[in-house]
């Protein structure tokens, strides 16, 4: 699960360089990564 989320975040960051990603999606994943780091 952690690997999938890492790949998903990596894809999200790489795609954000080409396409504008809604801030809602970015904030959503930021919260998830914060929860993962916290736990």
UniProtKB/Swiss-Prot annotation:
Where does this protein chiefly localize?
mitochondrion
Q: Does the keyword Repressor apply?
A: no
Assigned protein family: Belongs to the universal ribosomal protein uL16 family.
What name has this protein been given in UniProt? Large ribosomal subunit protein uL16m
Keyword list (alphabetical) reads: Mitochondrion, Ribonucleoprotein, Ribosomal protein
Q: Which GO terms describe its cellular component?
A: mitochondrion; ribonucleoprotein complex; ribosome
Its subcellular locations are: Mitochondrion
Residue stretches spanning the membrane: none
Keyword Electron transport applies: no
């Amino acid at each position: 699960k952690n690997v999938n989320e890492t790949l998903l975040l990596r894809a999200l960051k790489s795609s954000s360089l080409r396409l504008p990603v809604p801030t809602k999606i970015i904030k959503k994943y930021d919260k998830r990564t914060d929860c993962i780091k916290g736990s």
